[in-house]
């Protein structure tokens, strides 16, 4: 559902931000 999509997007966003901070 829409909530799952939102959760997936949030996870991907956090992963991306964490990656940028790590670099």
Curated annotation (Swiss-Prot):
Recorded superkingdom: Eukaryota
Lineage: Eukaryota, Metazoa, Chordata, Craniata, Vertebrata
Localization of this protein: Secreted
The keyword Cell inner membrane is annotated on this UniProt entry: no
Entry function: Antimicrobial peptide that shows higher potency against Gram-negative bacteria than against Gram-positive bacteria. Has a very week hemolytic activity.
Entry-annotated residues carrying Asparagine amide: 23
Keyword line: Amidation, Amphibian defense peptide, Antibiotic, Antimicrobial, Secreted
One Gene Ontology term, aspect cellular component: extracellular region
Gene Ontology biological process terms, A to Z: defense response to Gram-negative bacterium
Family: Belongs to the ascaphin family.
Protein name: Ascaphin-1
Tissue distribution: Expressed by the skin glands.
């Amino acid at each position: 559902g829409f909530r799952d999509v939102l959760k997936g997007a949030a996870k991907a966003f956090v992963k991306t931000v964490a990656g940028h901070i790590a670099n």
